[in-house]
Amino acid sequence: MKLLIVFGLLTSVYCIHKECSIQECCENQPYQIEDPCPIHYYSDWFIKIGSRKSARLVQLCEGDYGKRIPIHYEMFGNYTISCEPLEINCQAPPVGSLIVRCSYDYDFVEHHDVRVVLDFI
């Protein structure tokens, strides 16, 4: 229990210094993630593998907006259920962290990333 409290505090401190969204979901149940991007912004979802700024981003959905479909990777199992809106199987990402890239432009020339932390209930 103490470890869980310490982890929660560390996550909160991390989120204060970086853009972060904490969301609650029931473990191993379908969960529709709330999009933390501002209204009228495009969002694209990734798993960030590694902790460095230059870490690899693995895209979770593909296709044009309005017709996006999940990309299923063997290493992630059935993590992504649907894309518009993003629905996942509520569990910690198999590797790395869940990231949403927000951009006002369709081509994501200028963007900012938001880390999404799932709190399991």
Swiss-Prot record:
The keyword Cytoplasm does not apply. The keyword Nucleus does not apply. Keywords: Disulfide bond, Signal. InterPro entries: ORF8_bat_SARS-CoV_HKU3-1-like, ORF8_betacoronavirus, SARS_ORF8_IG. Pfam families: bCoV_NS8. Residues 1-15 form the signal peptide. Disulfide bonds join C25-C90, C37-C102, C61-C83. Residues 19-121 form the SARS ORF8 Ig-like domain. PROSITE patterns: SARS_ORF8_IG (PS51964). This protein corresponds nearly to the fused 8a and 8b proteins of SARS-CoV. This is Non-structural protein 8.
